[in-house]
């Protein structure tokens, strides 16, 4: 899954943003589970990138009064 830019998030529909947010949350849970189980993540910076992308989506949702 690619990290989304703010401009890409703004062009999405409400449903697409909600779906992407849910997918990212699930991916974050999987990455954290892998780390907590003692496994080494493929890309250690991925967790931070996922968190920032989730924050971007939520920020835009608040700006557009979707929440």
From Swiss-Prot:
Domain of life, per lineage: Archaea
CDD domains per the UniProt record, alphabetical: Ribosomal_L29_HIP
A Pfam match: Ribosomal_L29
GO MF annotation list: structural constituent of ribosome
Keyword set, alphabetical order: Ribonucleoprotein, Ribosomal protein
GO biological process, one term: translation
GO cellular component, one term: ribonucleoprotein complex
Transmembrane region(s): none
HAMAP family (alphabetical): Ribosomal_uL29 (MF_00374)
Family membership noted in the UniProt record: Belongs to the universal ribosomal protein uL29 family.
Protein name: Large ribosomal subunit protein uL29
């Amino acid at each position: 899954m690619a990290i989304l830019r703010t401009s890409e998030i703004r062009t999405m529909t409400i449903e697409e943003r909600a779906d992407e947010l849910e997918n990212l949350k699930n991916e974050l849970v999987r990455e954290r589970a892998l780390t907590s189980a003692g496994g080494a993540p493929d890309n250690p910076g991925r967790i931070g990138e996922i968190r920032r992308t989730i924050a971007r989506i939520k920020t835009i949702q608040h700006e557009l009064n979707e929440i």
